């Protein structure tokens, strides 16, 4: 949070971690305790923080928009927000737009990537099996008009320059 403030970033993104399979009550208590520490630091530095859910394989603390809304309600800070990596709900068989519907004005960021349809692998937006044009239309129809990031992750580590060129072409194609 301190570095984000010094760099002048719009927000700092924090992904939900994994508790190591603690029982739910202990897991939730630890999550809220950690997020309250983050809240205090964010408020002291006036630095917005965005929380990202992950899939159940990556996190056992917060994986659905309803859980994220509950966490944001519990912490209640004007500087804590939620976001959606569209691959996460897609591989879980959920509608990514539910994040916008459930979080409302606390929903401030999208990670746009595509999916191979069976795991967390992130492909270039528009090169997988997701109906990306429909997803974009649905987010716009839900009133979302904030930030988005086109994600390139480890799948493209061998040739990131070529992948960057492809993702920029896709951004132009989708007018992002």
What are these regions (language model features)?
Residues 2, 8-10, 36, 62-84, ...:
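Histidine-acidic metal/acid-base catalytic patches
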């Amino acid at each position: 949070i301190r570095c984000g403030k010094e760099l002048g970033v719009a927000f700092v993104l924090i992904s939900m971690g994994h508790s190591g399979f603690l029982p739910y009550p202990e897991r939730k208590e630890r999550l809220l305790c950690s997020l309250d520490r983050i809240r205090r630091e964010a408020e002291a530095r006036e630095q917005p923080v965005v929380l990202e859910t992950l899939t159940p394989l990556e996190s056992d603390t917060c994986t659905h928009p309803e859980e994220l809304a509950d966490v944001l309600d519990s912490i209640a800070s004007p500087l804590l927000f939620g976001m959606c990596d569209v691959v996460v709900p897609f591989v879980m068989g959920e509608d990514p737009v539910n994040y916008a519907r459930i979080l409302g004005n606390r929903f401030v960021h999208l990670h746009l990537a595509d999916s191979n349809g069976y795991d967390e692998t992130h492909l270039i937006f528009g090169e997988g099996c997701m109906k990306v044009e429909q997803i974009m239309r649905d987010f716009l129809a839900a009133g979302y008009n904030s930030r988005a990031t086109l994600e390139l992750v480890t799948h493209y580590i061998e040739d990131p320059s070529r992948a960057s060129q492809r993702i920029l072409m896709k951004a132009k194609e989708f007018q992002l």
